[in-house]
From Swiss-Prot:
Gene label: dsrF
UniProt cross-references to InterPro entries, sorted A to Z: DsrEFH-like, Sulphur_relay_DsrE/F-like, Sulphur_relay_TusC/DsrF
PANTHER family: PROTEIN TUSC
Function: Not known. Could be involved in the oxidation of intracellular sulfur.
Pfam families hit by this protein: DsrE
Domain of life (superkingdom): Bacteria
Family that this chain belongs to: Belongs to the DsrF/TusC family.
Listed name of the protein: Intracellular sulfur oxidation protein DsrF
Length: 136
């Protein structure tokens, strides 16, 4: 009997700190990947701040978990998207975001940055292709 692989999309809409949504979303993404599900992560609205470089949480007394995002590729989370309109509305560009890289262990091919900035039409396509969409 073969295992059923579901396509899970995780929408990250909240700022990285101030609530537990961003941290919990990251945990759920890693759990989905650990169970070999087809995981897609989309950052939109204030969620785009989760991927910004140089986060410093000393002043707010919270643990900075942003370095964990850079390891997503190593956990076989290879479909990572950022909504272009959300970036532009916040005065950000892809250059402001962390790079998520990984090495394919089978082919030894290296991928420098798998974060893809997409438009709203592509966001809709990805949602329609997903078996389940979780919003945080």
């Amino acid at each position: 009997m073969s295992e059923v692989v579901k396509k899970f999309m995780y929408l990250n809409r909240k700022a990285p700190y101030g609530t537990i949504y961003a941290w919990e979303a990251l945990e759920v993404v890693l759990i989905g990947a650990a169970f070999d599900q087809d995981v897609c992560v989309l950052f939109l609205d204030d969620g785009v701040y989760q991927l910004t470089r140089g986060q410093d949480t000393k002043g707010i007394g919270m643990k900075n978990f942003s370095p964990t995002y850079r390891t997503l590729g190593d956990y076989e989370v290879r479909r990572i998207y950022v909504d272009r309109d959300s970036l532009e509305a916040r005065g950000l560009t892809q250059d402001d975001l962390v790079e998520i890289a990984f090495e394919d262990m089978e082919t030894e091919e290296e991928f420098d940055n798998i974060v893809e900035v997409i438009d709203s039409a592509r966001v809709s396509e990805l949602m329609n292709e997903s078996d389940a969409v979780f919003s945080f």
